[in-house]
Amino acid sequence: VRHSGNSFSFALESAILKKYAVLGLHEAYLNPSVLEFFQKYQCTYSLYEDYLDGRSLLSDLELFMNSLETNQTLGIEIDMDAIANMPSSAQSPSGWRFDEVRTYLRKIASSHQNIPYLHLTEAAPINESDDRIVGKALAYLVIDFSTQYCLKRVR
């Protein structure tokens, strides 16, 4: 999830958005203004480095999901920069494994009733090889979300 100078900031400031969570923010990118923003709007956030030290993302996801009302609208944004070695605007060797992201997305999509929004941001291929990787990655995420969310609604 992104957190500065974007539509989420506007939505929080305008009281359109009730809750906001950023899970796995890299500590090196947590500047004082972002921290102040999170505190001002009572945002939930966690650091990626805490997960390296044993914190459970699955537990954090469950906590956040349990804090939502049953039919509360939920939007999901996955910043492709957060995936290790993903061709993206801020590509990094450190980050989530792609299959971890798929697992967590599938978990969220299958466990909540009202998710009209999936935004996959910052993928930025620069050559033909990157095009294939990014294309397949985005396709997997869309298929995972669609099948899990739709299957849950049919059951």
Where would I find each of the regions flagged by the language model?
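Conserved alpha-helical scaffold segments that buttress catalytic/binding sites
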Residues: V1-R155
